[in-house]
From Swiss-Prot:
This is Peptide chain release factor 1. It comes from Streptomyces griseus subsp. griseus (strain JCM 4626 / CBS 651.72 / NBRC 13350 / KCC S-0626 / ISP 5235). The lineage of its organism: Bacteria, Bacillati, Actinomycetota, Actinomycetes, Kitasatosporales. HAMAP family: Rel_fac_1. The modification N5-methylglutamine is found at residue 237. GO terms for molecular function: translation release factor activity, codon specific. InterPro entries: PCRF, Pep_chain_release_fac_I, Pep_chain_release_fac_I_sf, Prokaryotic/Mito_RF, RF-1. SUPFAM superfamilies: Release factor (SSF75620). PROSITE patterns: RF_PROK_I.
Length: 358
């Protein structure tokens, strides 16, 4: 059943020998790469060994049970254990997303629905900030444009693991969970400005990209156009009398990133470059995978109510994820950051699809 694992065991053994050689660690970048791959393979190897050992234990128990019926119960218990180990191993063999260890940049944009959409974008921001707090991630608002009523027309947030340099364990980065949030989120509720109690529908778009490191994307200075301007607050009010806001355009691709939240032009430029690197990395990955059914490609760039991935229905206190058929009636808790159940439903559906195609 798991013939391919033997090759992985061979690779794991080879890596173990290489990492035991002190000379390998002279090249730190290569050593990190080897260590990362070794860490990825270790749980597969240990689980496979447990799977084989359990199979041998079952055969032994069956031989004893032929002479002593008291061993029949032990056979059943071992068979149950092997089923659990088999499923665990199958999941470990699901093709990994190479970005799963990365931190992310999260962008929320108000869409159809005017002020109500901007308020909903603010609700989504709070939901993600609370979720990050619950799981122990760090967040940093990089850039934002507030609306008149206190919501957001656009807001960009960096979400990081505690270390701030991606996951310490394979597949445990922010991207591994947050990548499923990309798309159009629809809200159904009675706005505070609605005098007749009618339910309105509006939407906000969420874009999630893995945060790129400088080594991930090569950017040439002569490919950039950098514009500076005065940052502004809600309604266009000037909040800065100097040209500290920065907009960077990558001329070959037309990708644009901007930042105005920091106090100095240099800080805004650094933040805008972070955003630009991540957007270019995401664009390159999408181009390379355009023939594949990768979840990242389902993220919707245009905020159109008809292209929804999720609905937040306030009158029914219901949240629905239309991609996986998830439905729950605890919207108030979800908006307070209890997102694990809906995200896990997406993780499970993605794993099942990858297993089916493996």
């Amino acid at each position: 059943m798991f013939e391919a694992v033997e090759e992985l065991i061979g690779e794991h053994t080879g890596l173990e020998k290489k990492l035991a050689d002190p000379s390998v660690h002279a090249d730190q970048a290569n050593a990190r790469k080897l260590n990362k791959r070794y860490a990825e393979l270790t749980p597969i190897v240990s689980t496979y060994r447990a799977w084989k050992q359990t199979g041998e234990d079952i055969e032994t128990a069956r031989e004893f049970a032929a002479d002593d019926p008291d061993f029949a119960a032990e056979v059943k218990e071992l068979e149950k254990q092997r089923e659990e180990i088999t499923e665990k191993l199958r999941l470990l063999l699901v093709p990994r997303d190479p970005s799963d260890d990365k931190d992310v940049l999260l962008e929320i944009k108000a869409g159809a629905g005017g002020d109500e959409s901007a308020l909903f974008a603010g609700d989504l921001l709070r939901m993600y900030l609370r979720y990050a707090e619950r799981v122990g991630w760090k967040t940093e608002i990089i850039d934002s444009t507030e609306s008149e009523l206190g919501g957001y027309k656009d807001v960009q947030v960096a979400v990081k693991t505690k270390g701030g340099n991606g996951a310490t364990e394979p597949g445990q980065g922010v991207w591994a969970r947050m990548k499923y949030e990309g798309g159009v989120h629809r809200v159904q509720r009675v706005p505070s400005t609605e005098s007749q109690g009618r339910i309105h529908t509006s939407a906000a778009g969420v874009l999630v990209t893995p945060e790129a490191e400088e080594v991930d994307v090569e950017i040439h200075a002569n490919d950039l156009r950098i514009d500076v301007y005065r940052s502004s607050g809600p309604g266009g009010q000037s909040v800065n009398t100097t040209d500290s806001a920065v907009r960077i355009t990558h001329l070959p691709t037309g990708v644009v990133a901007s930042c105005q939240n920091e106090k100095s032009q240099l800080q805004n430029k650094e933040q805008a470059m972070r955003i630009l690197r991540s957007r270019l990395l995401a664009a390159a990955q999408e181009a390379a995978e355009q023939e594949a059914s990768d979840v990242r490609r389902s993220q919707v760039r245009t905020v159109d109510r008809s292209e929804k991935i999720r609905t937040y229905n306030f009158p029914e206190n219901r949240i629905s994820d239309h991609r996986v058929g998830f439905k729950a009636y605890n919207l108030d808790q979800v908006l307070d950051g209890e997102l694990d159940a809906v995200i896990q439903a997406c993780v499970d559906a993605d794993s099942a699809a990858k297993l089916a195609n493996a």
